[in-house]
Amino acid sequence: MKRTLLLLPAIACLSLSVFAQVPVDKTISLQSVEIQGKRFGGLTGGEVKRLQVDSNLSGLTGTTADVFRLLPSVVTDIEGGITFRGSNNPGLLINGVPYGLLEEYSGDMLIQLPALFFDRVSMTSTPSIGLVPDGDAGILNLSSVVYTAADSPLVLTLGAGFQERYNAGAILNLHPGKFHIVGKYNYRREFRKRTFSKSTTNKGGTTVMNNNASARPDVHLADLSVGYDLTANDLITVYGLYNLMDYSRYGKIHNNKLVDGNLQPVMFRHRYNDQRQEAYAAEARWYHTFDNPKDRLDVVFNYNNFGYDEDNEYKNEKPETGKIIAEDNYYVNQDKNNYYLSVLYGKLFADDWHLRVGYIGRFKDESYHAYGNKLAAGEWQSDPQKENEYNFNRRTNLLLAALEKKWGGFCAEAGVQGELNWQKIDTRYQTDDVLEKIPMVKSTSRFHLFPRLKLGYRTDKAGELALSYVQRVIRPYGSYLNVFTDRSDATHVWKGNPDLKDEMIHSVELSYSYATSAFRFSPSLYYRNKKNRIMDKVLDEGENGTIWTKENIGHSQTFGFELSATWQPIRMLSLGLSGDIYRDEIDGRTIGYDRKKSMVCGDIKGSVNICITPTTELQLDGFYISDQLTPQGKIKHRSSVNAGISQYFMHRKLRANLSINNIFNGLEETTIVDTKDLQMTQVRNRDAQVTWVTLTYNL
């Protein structure tokens, strides 16, 4: 509590803006949305807020999860989970396209992905109609800077940090003739330590589980973009992406039971875990502009694959003797194939009428295979209860249309996305009390309209008022619908729910933005109404422990107020503040909960940026997030303060950067479950207190 009280005034005097010596006008875009805004060294404001990673001194040496925390109302936890305006399910895109590696394993990816690779992160609560309607509070998009012939043809990066951390990268930028070639590669290696503890009390008594684990992830990431100016009005681009994360992990799980007031060890379970996550993508884009530059046709086709392989070896040790009393293993193979096609056409008519129409198609095919063995009487035997074969298919076809009208300082847009969605699950699994495998085949289809409306008024040259309504959806990932119980990680046993329904969200926002060359002020009021809200729930399985699952937690609504302000009083100093406060309400009485729950939650964050000399820059930033509501309890507050300093050499061709993350080690996450029959306290933490030194050279 004392640490919290000390952090609040410290963070309150910080700012959200990222350092820039000279603020400049900047046109920002996310897919087909273009917003004119003022840029404070990396953070661009407006309907779409975009952060330039290499302008952020504490984030550029970190990961994408670290950088997300610098955006207004966006917070990430120690495992890469994202909270945006109180929602844990924002849409995640790469260059406006959904990817398989940004689904249920996105946390693993975000805490390993070097921040400098996708060096622009964007956020918007009112996405363009040309984007998929998935995501609760809005979307977060990863993209790269558009390199031109005026930029450096070669950029080299080399970094090292405490606890055996290393990073190296290169960017190649060439523009021969009509070609535009940009290739990037980054390698990152770390040695990570994690701690975990869980105390569970139910009718059977109290048990305590502790686990200290270490991991060595190796991450390779590369992409290549080749553009060609076919004509003065046509640009064709092909793009490829490859990502490999491979690591080994060891954990020793201590299982204890409270007997007569004394905590007695029951068993030590050793886990030797190897994981390999591999993703690749191939993409083609065609941009065509007509005689009127506002008339354009955009076509995008993307195929991306994500593979997940996990090998587990277990040994159970008797604490009293140190002897191994049981051995078993467990293997998981998962493969995802994603196809995406979008065709968007925009036409500007007389009197400032603008029409946009298009099609978006998404096709998913996933397979999941699990199996395991156990050592019995000195021989390895297959364990039928660990076997699972699961296939998931989804077909989503979406037609869209939007009409916009501008007159004077007013503008209005009305649009709709009409979607036909079909999906099928096909699984074979075995329960504890049935000897043969149980088949389950289930298919569903639906048609749904996603309407939207936006009204805007420009009050003067610097101010704009907007009122918007949009309907969005959260679709369960394929693995969330698999009824099989995954016991690969004893600290987090997981079971899918084949009866999960899509979560539907109605969002209304009233926002105002005021921007000059040195000051930006942006307050927003928002409201979200959710039907079939998807949230985590823990099940009490008695002597078998607890099992996590996903469930539709009835009706829910959120009222919130967001405020961000940035100010550059003098050339060498940039200040600001961002805060978000909201009332989160969960009404689960329709599914058996005894009462409606609510909590006032919020976060505050910011940074201060100083140009000490023309070649020396300093940044401090931090955030604090309050307790968060869950269906069965809460997640306790957490915070982080970071610092970064850069020194330029050789006429700014060489930069040395020192960053320190999570200075006060405040990211520890405590989850509390408090129900009539189950009380649980779970604490997770990892060594996020990291110091990095990075050298960047521009040819």
Model-derived features: positions:
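Short acidic/polar hinge/loop motifs at secondary-structure boundaries
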Residues: 64, 70, 98-125
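N-terminal periplasmic accessory domains that precede
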Residues: 64-67, 108-110, 123, 133-157, ...
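Extracytoplasmic beta-strand/coil segments of soluble accessory domains associated
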Residues: 65-101
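Face-selective signature of the C-terminal outer-membrane beta-barrel domain
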Residues: 223, 227-245, 273-430, 448, ...
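Outer membrane beta-barrel strand-and-loop segments of large Gram-negative receptors
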Residues: 338-342, 495-497, 501, 507, ...
